[in-house]
Structure formats: structure tokens, C-alpha cells
Amino acid sequence: MPFGVTAQVFRALRWKLVLREGRLSVILNSIFLSYASSLVVPRSGEVLRCGVVRRYDGADFSRLVGSVVSERIIDMLMILLLTLSAVLWQIPVFVRFMQRTGLSLGSVLSRFTPAGWWVTALSGVLILCTALWLVWRVQLFSSVKARLRGFRDGLVCVKRVKSPSLFVLYSVAIWLSYYLHFWVAFQCFDFTASVSSDCALVAFVVGCFAVLVPTPNGAGPWHFAVKTVLMLYGVSADDGAVFALFVHTLQTLLVVLLGLYALAALSLTKIKIR
């Protein structure tokens, strides 16, 4: 559990560094609350945390959203680096995982016909051109333009951080904490503690992609992905299911407790007068 908390603390420190405004306590509580919110409505937490900082510290909402998007891009790059490292280190395991789950890039792309690709591409271009014309040419959308400028400022604010090295350090610390949180759970069971540390890394990486499925805290896809990886390393299906259920329940409990703490803390926090 401690590493699960430190991951969110480092995330708050990184967001504070990017925003250069707002109280750290408000930012941290907004992040705690965002994960709890996503348990109820998947992916709602990102908007909620922006709303919390907007309400309590008066920051521009569009800029907050832009900064969150830029943060998530950085997180995705971190996941891709972890994935590349794990794949290069454990290529045979990933091949067996794809075979066992029936996943492959070819099987996904084969579902699209040439006509389907053309229709999708042309529709996307048409929608984009229409939206740009409305936003930049029609006076009725002047307020939208202002919000887009705020969003753009938030999106590029990562490039303007005062300490890029500290930003990188926080980003590494976030994902190291996530991994250590997962690795500690590995040591709690005889059947996972006895397998190689490579298994923990592969299961962690695969789990990162499983939680992208819009279910509460990745419930379902995450269990299946982690259990499947454990089975590839010789853990029985029953033991793998027990491990996945235990870790996911622990994570969910932590998210709920931190969310309740954030609600209590924010109720005692003064709103800045704007």
C-alpha cells in the first residue's frame, strides 16, 4: 500500500511542477478523488480533478485539461518504454501470451476492408476540416477559441517546466512506485514469490494495457491478463486468479480510502477568492 500512495504523491508533485500554480494539497486531493471517481464512472476522474483545482484554486479549466492530456502522453511514453524493455527481455513469453489470448495486430487490422479504411479516413478529415472552419471563422465560436487557446497552453506547458530533470525524476518515480506496489504483492504469496522477477515485470506491463479498457479500475480485463501471464510462468489457473483478485481488491480498497480522505480534506479547505 505505501507505494500505491507514493505514486499519487509523485503524480501531484509533477502536476504542480507543470501548472506552476495551485496548492499542492488541493492538487493531491484532486488526484485521490479522481481515481475514486473512475471506480464509479470510468475515465471521469481526469475531468473531475481539473474541476476540483478550478473550484478551489481558480485555475483555468481549459489549461488544466490540456496539462492532463500532456501528462497522459508522457505516461503513455513511459508505458511504451517499459513494454519495449519487457518485450525485448521476454520475447517468447509475449509470443505465447498473444497466442493464448488470440490477440494479434493482423487479426485486428483484417477486420477493416479497403472501403472501410477509405470511409473512416475521409470521414475523419471531413469532420476535422468542418470543426476547424467553425472554430476559427464563425464569430459564435469565439468563446470556444479562447478555451482552445487555454487548452493549447496547458498542452505545451510540459515544455516550459522550470526543471525538466525534476519532471523526468517524478515521472520515473511514479512508475517505479506502481511497479514496486505490484512487486510487493508478488512477495505475499508462495506461488508468485518463487517465480522469476521477470514474471512480475511482464504481468505489470500487460496489466497496464488491460486497465485501458473502460471498466472500473480495469476489473475483468486486468484479472484475465495478469492470470494469463502467471500461467505462462507455471502458476496454476486457480492460484493466478487468487493473486489477481487479491491485488485488484487491495488496489480498489486503497483508492476508496484515499478518495474518502480527499473528500474530508477538501471539505475543510478554503476556496480561494477569485
Features from the language model and the residues they span:
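Helix-loop junctions and terminal segments of transmembrane helices
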Residues: 12, 16, 47-52
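Transmembrane helix-loop junction
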Residues: 20, 39, 55, 187-191, ...
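Membrane-embedded alpha-helical segments of transport systems
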Residues: 36-41, 65-88, 245-257
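Short intracellular "coupling" helices and adjacent cytoplasmic loop segments at the cytosolic face
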Residues: 32-48, 55, 155
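Transmembrane alpha-helix interface/packing and boundary motifs in multi-pass membrane proteins
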Residues: 33-42, 202-223
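Interfacial segments of multi-pass membrane proteins
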Residues: 53-60, 154, 224-242
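Membrane-interface alpha-helices at helix entry/exit sites of multi-pass transporters
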Residues: 24-29, 44-46, 59-73, 80, ...
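Predominantly cytoplasmic-facing regulatory/coupling regions of multi-pass membrane proteins
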Residues: 1-32, 89-211, 250-274
